[in-house]
Amino acid sequence: MRVLRSPAKVNLGLWVTGKRADGYHDIVTVFHTVDFHDRIFIKRSHSLKIKTSSPLIPEGEENIVYKALKRFEEWTGVSPEVEVFIEKNIPAGAGLGGGSSNAAVVLKEVNSMYGEILSEKELSELASTIGADVPFFLKGGLAVAEGIGDKLRFLDKKIEREIFIIYPAVHVSTKEIYSKVTPDILTKKEDLHIIDSLLDDFEYFLENIENTLGEIALESYPQMREVYNTLEYLGYKPFVSGSGSSIFAFGKPEAEIEKICQVKGWKLIKTVLR
C-alpha cells in the first residue's frame, strides 16, 4: 500500500478577464500549494473502489477521483484496479482545491503504477478534462494560471511563508459566484502588470493583489465577511482563496484568533506555503 500526501492550495490573487463563448470565464490567478493535506491510501485490488473518511464527500461514481480514473481508462484502455481511501482534512467548498488535488495525486500514482503509460503532457491534458485546477496539482508549488485556470506557467521559486487559514464552515458554490460576475468588474489582461512583481517584490505584490470572485463571495456570504472583518480588525491583511469560503493571512495567528475560532466554530489551519 502507498500513502500519498494530497496538498491544499491558496490563490494569491484572482482576476476575471472575460467571459468565453462556452459560458466559462477567463481568469488570471496565482496558485501556491501549502503544507496542509489529505492523506490518500492506495493499493492494487480486483476492482476500482473509492472510499473517504468524510460523510460529506461522495464515494463511488460521484467521487472526482472515480471520475478521473474512469477518464484514465477511456484514454489508455487500461482499467485501473485499485482501492483508494481518502482521509479528508481539507474542507469541501473552501476554495482550497481538495477534490482537484485528490484527483491529480491519484491520477499521477496510477499512471506510475501502470508504467507511465501517459506522458507528462498527456496526463496534464487528461487532468484538464476533470477540472480546471487538476493539472496544477500534478506538480504543485507556485504557478501562474490563465484561461479557465488550466494554462499554467510554473515558477521555479517557492515562497516559503507561514500562513494561517480560517474556514468558516460554509460551503461556497463557485458556479453561483461566477454567475454574479458582471462586465464592469472585469480586468483587462494587459493591465495586470502586478504579476511581474510576484518574484521581484513579493511584499508589493501582496499589497496590491485583488480577488474578483472573493469580493463577490464576501458580499454573498456573511460568514466569510465576519472572518475577513475580524482579521482586519486585529491588524492582519486577509485574503480570500479562490471563490471562498476560506480566508487566509500571513504570519502566525494570535491567541485571540484561536479563541475566536473556537467560539465561532471556525476551522483554523496553521501551515506554510510550500
UniProtKB/Swiss-Prot annotation:
InterPro entries the UniProt entry points to: GHMP_kinase_C_dom (IPR013750), GHMP_kinase_C_sf (IPR036554), GHMP_kinase_N_dom (IPR006204), IspE (IPR004424), Ribosomal_Su5_D2-typ_SF (IPR020568), Ribsml_uS5_D2-typ_fold_subgr (IPR014721)
EC number annotated for this UniProt entry: 2.7.1.148
Annotated GO biological process: isopentenyl diphosphate biosynthetic process, methylerythritol 4-phosphate pathway; terpenoid biosynthetic process
Cell membrane recorded as keyword: no
First-level EC class: transferase
Binding, ATP: 91-101
Active site location: 9, 133
Keywords assigned by UniProt, alphabetized: ATP-binding, Isoprene biosynthesis, Kinase, Nucleotide-binding, Transferase
Pathway recorded for this protein: Isoprenoid biosynthesis; isopentenyl diphosphate biosynthesis via DXP pathway; isopentenyl diphosphate from 1-deoxy-D-xylulose 5-phosphate: step 3/6
Record SUPFAM superfamilies: GHMP Kinase, C-terminal domain (SSF55060), Ribosomal protein S5 domain 2-like (SSF54211)
UniProt catalytic activity: 4-CDP-2-C-methyl-D-erythritol + ATP = 4-CDP-2-C-methyl-D-erythritol 2-phosphate + ADP + H(+)
GO MF annotation list: 4-(cytidine 5'-diphospho)-2-C-methyl-D-erythritol kinase activity; ATP binding
Domain of life of the organism encoding this protein: Bacteria
Function recorded in the entry: Catalyzes the phosphorylation of the position 2 hydroxy group of 4-diphosphocytidyl-2C-methyl-D-erythritol.
HAMAP family: IspE
Family the entry assigns: Belongs to the GHMP kinase family. IspE subfamily.
Protein name according to UniProt: 4-diphosphocytidyl-2-C-methyl-D-erythritol kinase
Lineage start: Bacteria, Pseudomonadati, Aquificota, Aquificia, Aquificales
Gene: ispE
